[in-house]
Amino acid sequence: MTSHAQLIPDHETSSLPTRIKQLAREAGFELCGIAPVREFAELRAFPGWISAGRHGAMKYMEARDEAGELKRASLARVAPWTRSVIVCAINYNTAQLYSTQTKDPSHGWISRYAWSREDYHEAVMRRLRAVESKLSDLLEPRDDNRAPPDGSLQTRCYVDTGPLVERVFAKYAGVGWIGKNTCIINQKLGSWLFLGVILTSIELADCSSVDPPAYDLPAPDRCGTCTRCIAACPTQAIVAPGELDARLCISYLTIEKRGEIPEELRTGLGRHVFGCDICQDVCPWNRRAPVTAAEEFQPREALVNPALQWLAEMTPEEFRSRFRGSPVRRAKLSGLRRNAVIAMGNSADEKFLPTLKRLAEDADPIVADHAKWALEQLQSRSQ
């Protein structure tokens, strides 16, 4: 009998994995699975991805232990006491149209995950802590198969912040499969998922010895022959199924990349000013993806299709005020304005000419340089 993470049931049973999943449901998660700690193939491939430089300037991905080994390639280098990884997921999709369904060139696109009223790191972590706080209550005294030898319980929570590759453990916890766009895709919820993990010293019985298994099994890959995400990427960042070159990815370029964006990639950014959803927007599994009921993930209306003019001329005070508690702050004001003037250059809208002429003399040299490029784009089209 196989076992995959499913939408969490309302009923309770006596098994420890089911009770853990019940805690996750009570905390507001829609999916929960439990993976063993193994040297999974995807983790073994991680050093090669780093060696190829496909992580770009994200130096934190290169974090190494005292022996010089990449931490993200093995949990043993991060938390050697970990025996099981609890992976929780919550849907953040909203009722607004996808980026591929809205084409207004005078407005920019902020990635759907960043619209929320509360930073997802905090919202998901709060739920994880609620689960973590009750785990010890589930353990029977002196149950050596579940607790470490000294009887204590060790845990650690991560929400996109720790030195591990969450999607790999999400796959092996049965939460979903890793799509060709590298996102976790769930058959019922699609890929609009925030992931949170709890590392724990709880050791469940081996999968092969229990029916149903104590650990969840990987969800089967249901991408099939579909390559829509690969074909739709404007910058060809998906270099092979399941393999992303961050240096070409619009999300990386608009969020993580500091300084100048290579000229040959600017046109591909289109109207994106923070992140990109295209590879998820075109995914067939997201056609009927349900919307979230979580209040924290309802959108701030000002962040849905914001006017490029507003973004390009934003002041530091307005940036701090508008994006307080928002992931958009990661791009910093300079990066957001840079992205906005690139989008103006891609808009083919001559109404931006006066603004770009002013911004070409901006005190921020990055904004000024990209405004000059954008100005040239519009002027060349008007001739």
PLM region descriptions:
Residues 343-346, 373-377:
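Core register positions within helices of long alpha-helical scaffolds
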Residues 48, 86, 193-199, 238-266, ...:
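Non-heme iron-sulfur electron-transfer modules
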Residues 2-220, 261:
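Auxiliary alpha/beta "docking" domains used to position bulky ligands
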Residues 333, 363-364:
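Short inter-helical turns and helix N-cap capping residues of alpha-solenoid HEAT/ARM repeat scaffolds
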Residues 310-314, 322-327, 355-363:
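Alpha-solenoid HEAT/Armadillo-like helical repeat scaffolds in large eukaryotic proteins
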Residues 320-322, 349-360, 380-383:
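Amphipathic alpha-helical scaffolding segments comprising HEAT/armadillo-like alpha-solenoid repeats
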Residues 336, 366-368:
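Positions within the helices of HEAT/ARM-like alpha-solenoid repeats
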Residues 29, 228-251, 272-296, 355:
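Iron-sulfur cluster-binding cysteine motifs and their immediate structural context
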